[in-house]
């Protein structure tokens, strides 16, 4: 097959320019960002907004020219029942098939991270929330010690999102403008109690924990605080990379 000659421009053949090869990237010399962050907190603490913000923040997942599907998972997903606001890995019915399924979900997600450790993982509520709910709703104590050992081996960090006293009412008013299930915000004392319980349970965890006051809602500043903390702990990068540097 013959090549089509270049078009004539002003009576002269058009000049074919050689493609310029881009300069070799220096990214290969920079440690890969592989943070693994569990966001815990009661409702109205902006944890889900923060999860999405962290999952796109350049200091957490690296600079990007376009949106990318970094993993973001949540134990709040109510996938055990065929209706909205049903049950899932946090609020399962204890002592039977649902509890076994919930524990299998936690095990499966941790195994997934173990199989792909050199990547970022953002988790919106996980095992600490399950402990809190089961204690509150059923006086049922869950033992996640083995799970936490695996999470610690993966260098998973916990960010406990909290809200200052005196701001719950305003936060509820803001949420009710968009909520599809407003009755869940009737009892603000429940959220206050759950926040204290989550504080206690996070204090019992063997994982690194940062308590983060999210009241003011400046997501970029909050992401910066998380990035500063994880940079100080070394949790942003693979341990092999930080130990070799």
What are these regions (language model features)?
Residues 45, 52-114, 133-135:
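Conserved substrate/cofactor phosphate-moiety recognition/catalytic segment
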Residues 140-141, 148-200:
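A glycine- and Lys/Arg-enriched "phosphate-lid" helix/loop adjacent to the NTP-binding pocket
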């Amino acid at each position: 097959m013959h090549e089509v000659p270049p078009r004539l421009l002003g009576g002269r053949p058009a000049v074919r320019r050689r493609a310029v090869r881009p300069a070799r990237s220096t990214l290969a010399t920079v440690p890969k960002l592989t943070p693994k962050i569990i966001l815990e907190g009661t409702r109205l603490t902006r944890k889900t907004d923060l999860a999405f913000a962290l999952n796109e923040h350049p200091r957490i997942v690296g600079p990007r020219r376009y949106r990318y599907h970094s993993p973001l998972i949540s134990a709040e997903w109510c996938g055990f029942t065929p209706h909205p606001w049903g049950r899932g890995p946090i609020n399962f019915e204890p002592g039977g098939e649902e509890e076994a399924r919930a524990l299998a979900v936690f095990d499966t997600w941790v195994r997934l991270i173990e199989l792909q450790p050199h990547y970022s993982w953002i988790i919106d509520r996980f095992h600490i929330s399950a402990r809190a709910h089961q204690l509150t709703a059923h006086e049922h104590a869950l033992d996640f010690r083995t799970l936490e050992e695996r999470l610690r081996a993966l260098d998973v960090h916990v960010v406990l999102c909290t809200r200052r006293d005196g701001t719950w009412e305003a936060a509820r008013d803001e949420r009710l403008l968009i909520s599809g299930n407003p009755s869940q915000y009737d009892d603000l004392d429940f959220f206050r109690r759950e926040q204290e319980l989550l504080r206690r349970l996070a204090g019992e965890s063997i994982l690194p924990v940062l308590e983060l006051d999210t009241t003011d809602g400046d997501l970029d500043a909050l992401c910066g605080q998380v990035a500063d903390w994880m940079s100080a702990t070394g949790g942003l990068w693979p341990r092999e990379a930080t130990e070799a540097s």
